[in-house]
Swiss-Prot record:
InterPro entries: Class_I_gatase-like (IPR029062), GATASE (IPR017926), Imidazole-glycPsynth_HisH (IPR010139). Heterodimer of HisH and HisF. One of its GO terms (molecular function) is imidazoleglycerol-phosphate synthase activity. PANTHER family: IMIDAZOLE GLYCEROL PHOSPHATE SYNTHASE SUBUNIT HISH. This is Imidazole glycerol phosphate synthase subunit HisH. Keywords: Amino-acid biosynthesis, Cytoplasm, Glutamine amidotransferase, Histidine biosynthesis, Hydrolase, Lyase. Pathway: Amino-acid biosynthesis; L-histidine biosynthesis; L-histidine from 5-phospho-alpha-D-ribose 1-diphosphate: step 5/9. It comes from Dehalococcoides mccartyi (strain CBDB1). It catalyses: 5-[(5-phospho-1-deoxy-D-ribulos-1-ylimino)methylamino]-1-(5-phospho-beta-D-ribosyl)imidazole-4-carboxamide + L-glutamine = D-erythro-1-(imidazol-4-yl)glycerol 3-phosphate + 5-amino-1-(5-phospho-beta-D-ribosyl)imidazole-4-carboxamide + L-glutamate + H(+); L-glutamine + H2O = L-glutamate + NH4(+). Coiled coil: none annotated.
C-alpha cells in the first residue's frame, strides 16, 4: 500500500494524479498507524516549512515519519517535504524542523530571481536505480526559495545550479527527497515516481 501523507497542506492533487497515471493505488491519510503500515510513503510539500512542521506535529505525523525512516520504510519527500526532514531552516527566522537528516536549509543567494520557478537541470552525482531511464542533465520543475545543505555530502544524489550548486535530490538508504516537483516534470518526473515505486514495491501495483 502507498500512503500519501495529508497534513493539511501539500501538493496533493498533482501527486495523486501522477500516482494514478502510473496505475498505482494509494491511500490519502493523516493516520500515523496507517502510514507506518504502508509499503511506501509520499510526503508532499508546498508553502512555508514552519506551517508544514506545525501541520505534521498537530497530527502526530512528525513522530510517524521519524519512525518510518528508522524502520527503513521507503519514503519520497517532495519540495518542502524534503526541507522539513533537516535540522532547521532559515525560513521565518530560524525554524526547527524534524531533524531526521543532519543539515540546514538555506535561502537561495542574492543575485538570482527568488523564488526559482521553472525548469532546471539535474546533475546526477551517483549511479542509482532511481535514475533508470532518466538521462543525466534532464530538466525538472522547481518552485522554491530555499535549499537543503546536508551535513553528510554522501547523501547527495543530484545537484542543480541556481546561483549556487545546491543539493536537489537526497538518497539515504530508502529515503528519497527531491527539491523539485516530479509530478510537474512531465514524462521524466513520472519515470522517477515509477522507479521509486518499483524499488519500494517490486512489480506490485
Amino acid at each position: 500500500m502507498i500512503a500519501l501523507v495529508d497534513y493539511g497542506g501539500g501538493n496533493l492533487k498533482s501527486v495523486a494524479n501522477a500516482i494514478h497515471a502510473l496505475g498505482y493505488e494509494f491511500t490519502l491519510t493523516s493516520d500515523p498507524k496507517e502510514i507506518l503500515s504502508a509499503q511506501a510513503v509520499i510526503l508532499p510539500g508546498v508553502g512555508a516549512a514552519a506551517d508544514t512542521v506545525a501541520g505534521l506535529r498537530a497530527k502526530g505525523l512528525d513522530e510517524a515519519i521519524k519512525e518510518l525512516v528508522k524502520r527503513d520504510i521507503p519514503l519520497l519527500a517532495i519540495c518542502v517535504g524534503m526541507q522539513v526532514l533537516f535540522d532547521s531552516t532559515e525560513e521565518g527566522g530560524q525554524t526547527k524542523c524534524l531533524g531526521i537528516l543532519a543539515g540546514e536549509v538555506k535561502r537561495l543567494p542574492d543575485g538570482v530571481k527568488i523564488p526559482q520557478m521553472g525548469w532546471n537541470q539535474l546533475k546526477q552525482r551517483v549511479s542509482h536505480p532511481l535514475f533508470e531511464g532518466i538521462p543525466d542533465g534532464t530538466d525538472f520543475y522547481f518552485v522554491h526559495s530555499y535549499y537543503a545543505s546536508p551535513a553528510d555530502r554522501n547523501i547527495i544524489g543530484a545537484t542543480t545550479d541556481y546561483g549556487v550548486d545546491f543539493c536537489s535530490l537526497v538518497i539515504n538508504k530508502r529515503l528519497i527527497a527531491t527539491q523539485f516537483h516530479p509530478e510537474k516534470s512531465g514524462s521524466y518526473g513520472l519515470k522517477l515516481y515509477q522507479n521509486f515505486f518499483k524499488m519500494a514495491l517490486g512489480d506490485k501495483k
